[in-house]
């Protein structure tokens, strides 16, 4: 059906313009359709990948181009991926045709005034132009440009949403970091308080242990002091007894020596007295009788005094 629709206007056009000359008709047709055909040909030369790629993925595609050329694979466009519902249901422009974009009355008047065409010929030429534009330009325009614009809008929306998401994620991260930081500060404070409490408990225990050790050491010192006092008392008693014993022995020795010396002195005196008495008797023989009792008296005194001195020495 599409082939019949495309060929019917050409056949009708050939049959109806034979009388007025084909060259003039072709010149007018080429003058009006040449710029439009150039636009349509330029659209065909554009690759689908360049139109379908979003601005965010252009750098990646530039890097992947040499690899694709080496492999001999062509880039896949969006026509194979998305359907026409992407355009019709999107927020972008709607697909259009040449009937909606061209001013057919203006072209009709130009053909009537400058080309000297009849009414039917003008209608056929305009229908042919509209069909060619739809086939060569607006089909590609609807398939490529509108989708590209929609993709650009979607990419822009995606980028804006991405920035919003990044901002929200960053804010959430910042809030979470702040919360974690506050929790860490709280934990540090609690840890410091627990550490202080533990230090206080340890200090109390150490003080108690120190007091117990001090008391035990004090008791041990008192016991040692008592033992030392007892030992000192024993030693002092022993020393006193030894000293007293030595002193007594010395005193007794001195007594015996004094008694001996006293006895010797008394004996010497007695002997000297006896010698003196005997000598006096020899000198005075006549005086011996009255003097004998006088001489005997001191002997008795000496005998009586000797035991008194001995008692004093004892």
Swiss-Prot record:
Protein keywords: Coiled coil, Membrane, Mitochondrion, Transit peptide, Transmembrane, Transmembrane helix
Membrane topology: Single-pass membrane protein
Stretches with biased composition (Basic and acidic residues): 58-74
UniProt superkingdom: Eukaryota
One Gene Ontology cellular component: endoplasmic reticulum
Gene Ontology BP terms: regulation of proline metabolic process
Record-annotated disulphide pairs: none
TM helices/strands, residue ranges: 262-279
Subcellular location: Mitochondrion membrane
Stretches of the chain forming a coiled coil according to its record: 177-207
Positions of region (Disordered): 52-74, 281-314
Stretch forming the transit peptide: 1-29
Entries under PANTHER family matching the protein: MOZ PROTEIN REPRESENTS A CHROMATIN-ASSOCIATED ACETYLTRANSFERASE, PROTEIN FMP32, MITOCHONDRIAL
Protein name (Swiss-Prot/TrEMBL): Uncharacterized protein YLR283W, mitochondrial
Organism: Saccharomyces cerevisiae (strain ATCC 204508 / S288c)
């Amino acid at each position: 059906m599409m082939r019949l629709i495309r060929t019917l206007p050409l056949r009708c056009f050939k049959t109806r313009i034979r009388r007025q000359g084909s060259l003039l008709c072709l010149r007018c047709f080429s003058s009006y359709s040449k710029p439009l055909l150039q636009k349509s040909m330029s659209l065909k030369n554009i690759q689908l990948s360049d139109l379908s790629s979003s601005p965010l993925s252009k750098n990646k595609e530039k890097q992947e181009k040499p690899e694709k050329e080496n492999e001999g694979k062509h880039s896949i466009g969006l026509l194979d991926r998305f359907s026409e519902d992407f355009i019709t249901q999107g927020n972008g422009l709607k697909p259009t045709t040449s009937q909606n974009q061209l001013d057919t009355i203006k072209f009709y008047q130009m053909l009537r005034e400058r080309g000297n065409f009849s009414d039917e010929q003008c209608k056929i030429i305009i229908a042919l132009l509209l069909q060619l534009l739809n086939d060569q330009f607006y089909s590609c325009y609807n398939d490529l440009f509108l989708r590209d614009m929609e993709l650009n809008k979607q990419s822009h929306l995606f980028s804006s949403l991405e920035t919003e998401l990044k901002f929200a994620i960053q804010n959430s991260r910042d809030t979470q970091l702040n919360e974690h930081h506050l929790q860490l500060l709280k934990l540090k404070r609690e840890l410091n308080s627990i550490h202080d409490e533990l230090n206080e408990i340890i200090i109390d225990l150490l003080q108690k242990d120190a007091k117990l050790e001090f008391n035990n050491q004090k008791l041990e010192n008192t016991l040692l002091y008592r033992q030392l006092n007892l030992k000192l008392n024993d030693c002092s008693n022993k020393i006193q007894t030894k000293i007293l014993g030595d002193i007594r022995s010395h005193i007794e020795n001195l007594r015996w020596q004094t008694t001996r010396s006293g006895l010797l002195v008394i004996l010497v005196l007695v002997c000297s007295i006896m010698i003196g008495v005997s000598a006096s008797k020899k000198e005075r023989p006549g005086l011996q009788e009255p003097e004998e009792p006088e001489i005997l008296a001191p002997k008795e005194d000496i005998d009586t005094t000797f035991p008194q001195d001995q008692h004093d020495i004892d």
